[in-house]
Amino acid sequence: MKPSSSNSRSKGHAKARRKTREELDQEARDRKRLKKRRGHAPGSRAAGGNTTSGSKGQNAPKDPRIGSKTPIPLGVAEKVTKQHKPKSEKPMLSPQAELELLETDERLDALLERLEAGETLSAEEQSWVDAKLDRIDELMQKLGLSYDDDEEEEEDEKQEDMMRLLRGN
């Protein structure tokens, strides 16, 4: 015997219900109405459109049809070159005053302390410290001062003491 086909259909996929002509017509009208709504609303230019832009302290609405009020040059205008102001030169300090400023520089002291503690400085900091120390050396040479003077005096005294001991004074 053959199994009945009605039982297999109810358990399996149900056949899609066909839409009536009225339903198809209604869907077509809805699609057509949606297509008609494209574009801008009529009269948007006269109605104002953007109320937020261009209202910098003015209560009257600005007409978007009116253009810019900036003047436009009609003839050939010569370019005006701006003269650069010379930078004010730093007042020249005496070598003694500059040396005192460098010796009391807090940043230099802090970086030198970090170096003595064994820290490594960045390349920029290291170059800055080197430049300042070089400047201090230049100023000390100009002024006739030197860190080596104290060491040389101590060495001279030691030499003299050694000579005295050898001579038997």
UniProtKB/Swiss-Prot annotation:
Composition-biased stretches (Basic and acidic residues)? 20-30, 160-169
Matching InterPro entries: YihI
GO biological process assignments:
ribosome biogenesis
Among the GO molecular function terms of this UniProt record, one is:
GTPase activator activity
Region spans: Disordered: 1-98, 144-169
Cite the record's Basic residues compositional bias ranges. 10-19, 31-40
> What keyword terms does UniProt attach to this protein?
GTPase activation, Ribosome biogenesis
- Pfam families (UniProt xref): YihI (PF04220)
Keyword match S-adenosyl-L-methionine: no
Cell inner membrane among the record's keywords?
Answer: no
Regions of biased composition (Acidic residues) lie at: 147-159
Q: Where is the composition biased (Polar residues)?
A: 49-58
What does this protein do, in the record's words?
Answer: A GTPase-activating protein (GAP) that modifies Der/EngA GTPase function. May play a role in ribosome biogenesis.
Task: Please give the family membership noted in the entry.
Answer: Belongs to the YihI family.
HAMAP family linked to this entry: GAP_YihI
Q: What is this protein called?
A: Der GTPase-activating protein YihI
Q: Which organism is it from?
A: Escherichia coli O6:K15:H31 (strain 536 / UPEC)
Gene from which the chain derives? yihI
